């Protein structure tokens, strides 16, 4: 009689076939793990696990968003009565192309003039000073309650300008708009009623984009920011977690600013810094996803990278400054944990840089260990680390554009590649933030670029605020070339799935580097061509007018 133990010990022909067909090990008896391989694989898997940890957090945000979907801010039952006095602050610095548009839109805000004050806080050092002053004087003559305040220094940068303006502000509530924003006429009508709750310290509205369709770069930026506003702000605000004022398109209760210690300029994200300090003081924040404020996206790759680096460094600085106080505070652990994820999320950029350095040797080592191990270990970690990006950002498009979101699918590879392409710039920024390196607040130049508006592209070609190409672009091109070799190696070994995945690194690094390096030359050439075409058209236009 055959015992059960003997049956268990016998070879199962099905398992033998499965192992032979689906788990081949052609290097059995040839390949052995050595110390060098362990030195490659240990940090490789550690980085993948941490990235998967942060990637999985996006799914947690999605869960919070949909679980608390019913808890959207409702219109207040009682309006503010009497209406309070409001100050609108417009901080600008060298904004010759957009400052007049900003002032015109701010003066169009619908609110009793006797209760409204508009401050133009100008730190400019170029002809923006004359443009802004003349524009303010013109609207003041028309009866608008607007004042022009100019500083001869940039002490504290934007935070310093806001703090100095606050000293002379007369409003109980402070609305703030950056130079690249177009305040809607009904902004105060839609936001002020929410302050009928005396515990509300700040109301943030959602950004929308006047030049969303200008280029692939602006489309990608819009989708990335949509993900932030729809799911990050939506999930955090609905679940009662801390979230941040975005520096513009929002309105503060003055008392909340003062209780939190006012504007401080020891971080590059003074808005997030003040937001967390105010919420630690007990003030409630509201996010209104249905109230939009138009803005202008950067159209230049170098400007976009500078903006992203400033945000990455600023959040790390804010985390260093405030996370100890957040952990010690009496707020619930779920709020502390969400604040940790928010303020440390940019640590993923240095980890991505390490992964970029290790991925080719790790793939070679894993190939000799057998591809099935890559299938059930590496692939799930890769999906956890990066797959949530697709769900997160495409989900935001489905929320905002339910009838048109599928058209956004074509931008998904560019979204993934852009995130990869930013790793070098943002890694440098994050390391500076971690080690306390202070740097200047570098503003993002704006050019009054609007979709389908005549002269927008010519204005960009001829602008004086173009960002210079940084040495990082050359590093990105070198790394992109390295990944081109990695793709060649993967395809040569019939590792097609890995090769396709590595193509994202090629597109990300090479695309970002080449676009940063040559955009100025391409646009200069395009500007010359546009100028020549305009010169050729001029005589014909003149003759048509005379006839």
Residue ranges and their predicted role:
Residues 97-98, 328-351, 449-484:
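Loop-to-transmembrane boundary segments
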Residues 266, 275-293:
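Catalytic donor-sugar/metal-binding loop of nucleotide-sugar-dependent glycosyltransferases
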Residues 65-67, 77-80, 345-440, 470-538:
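Membrane-embedded multi-pass helical conduit in multi-pass membrane proteins
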Residues 136-173, 185-268, 279-280, 301-344:
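Long helical/loop segments within the catalytic core of UDP-sugar-dependent glycosyltransferases
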Residues 84-87, 117, 258, 273:
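Cell-envelope/extracellular polymer assembly enzymes that use nucleotide-activated donors
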Residues 100, 127, 177-194:
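Acidic donor-binding/catalytic loop of UDP-sugar-dependent glycosyltransferases
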Residues 104-150, 154:
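Acidic donor-binding segment of Leloir-type glycosyltransferases
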Residues 60-115:
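N-terminal signal-anchor transmembrane helix
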């Amino acid at each position: 009689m055959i015992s059960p133990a003997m049956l268990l010990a016998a070879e199962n022909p099905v398992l033998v076939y499965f192992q032979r067909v689906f788990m081949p090990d052609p290097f059995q008896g040839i390949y052995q793990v050595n110390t060098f391989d362990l030195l490659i694989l240990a940090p490789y898997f550690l980085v993948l696990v941490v990235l998967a940890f942060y990637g999985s957090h996006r799914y947690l945000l999605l869960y919070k968003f949909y679980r608390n979907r019913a808890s959207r801010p409702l219109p207040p039952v009682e309006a503010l009565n009497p209406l309070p006095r409001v100050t609108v602050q417009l901080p600008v610095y060298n904004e010759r192309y957009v400052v007049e548009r900003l002032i015109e839109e701010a003066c169009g805000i619908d609110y009793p003039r006797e209760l409204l004050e508009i401050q133009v806080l100008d730190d400019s050092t170029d002809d923006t000073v004359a443009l802004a002053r003349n524009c303010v004087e013109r609207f003041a003559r028309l009866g608008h309650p607007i004042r022009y305040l100019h500083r001869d220094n940039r002490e504290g940068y934007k935070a310093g300008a806001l703090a100095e303006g606050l000293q002379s502000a007369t409003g109980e509530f402070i609305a703030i708009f950056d130079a690249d924003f177009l305040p809607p006429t009904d902004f105060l009508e839609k936001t002020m009623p929410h302050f009928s709750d005396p515990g509300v310290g700040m109301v943030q509205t959602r950004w929308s984009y006047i030049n969303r369709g200008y280029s692939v770069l602006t489309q990608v930026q819009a989708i990335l920011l949509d993900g932030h506003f729809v799911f990050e702000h939506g999930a955090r605000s609905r679940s009662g977690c801390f979230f941040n004022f975005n520096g513009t398109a929002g309105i503060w209760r003055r008392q909340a600013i003062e209780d939190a210690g006012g504007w401080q300029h020891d971080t590059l994200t003074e808005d997030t810094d003040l937001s967390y300090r105010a919420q630690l003081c007990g003030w409630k924040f509201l996010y209104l996803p249905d109230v939009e404020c138009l803005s202008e996206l950067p159209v230049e790759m170098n400007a976009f990278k500078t903006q992203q680096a400033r945000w990455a460094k600023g959040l790390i600085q804010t985390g260093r400054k405030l996370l100890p106080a957040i952990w010690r505070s009496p707020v619930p652990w779920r709020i502390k944990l969400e604040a940790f994820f928010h303020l440390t999320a940019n640590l993923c950029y240095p980890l991505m840089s390490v992964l970029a350095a290790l991925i080719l040797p790790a793939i070679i080592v894993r190939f000799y260990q057998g591809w099935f191990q890559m299938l059930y270990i590496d692939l799930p970690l890769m999906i956890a680390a990066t797959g949530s990006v697709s769900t997160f950002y495409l989900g935001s498009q489905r929320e905002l554009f339910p009838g048109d979101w599928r058209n956004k699918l074509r931008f998904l590879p560019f979204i993934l590649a852009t995130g990869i392409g930013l790793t070098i710039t943002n890694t440098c920024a994050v390391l500076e933030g971690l080690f306390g390196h202070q740097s200047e607040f570098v503003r993002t130049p704006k050019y009054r670029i609007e979709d389908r508006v005549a002269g927008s592209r010519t204005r960009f070609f001829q602008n004086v605020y173009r960002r210079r190409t940084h040495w990082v672009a050359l590093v990105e091109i070198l790394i992109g070339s390295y990944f081109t070799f990695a793709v060649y190696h993967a395809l040569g070994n019939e590792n097609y799935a890995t090769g396709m995945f590595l193509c994202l690194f090629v597109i990300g690094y090479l695309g970002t580097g080449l676009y940063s390096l040559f955009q100025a030359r391409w646009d200069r050439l395009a500007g010359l061509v546009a100028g020549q075409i305009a010169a050729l058209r001029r005589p014909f236009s003149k003759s048509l007018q005379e006839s």
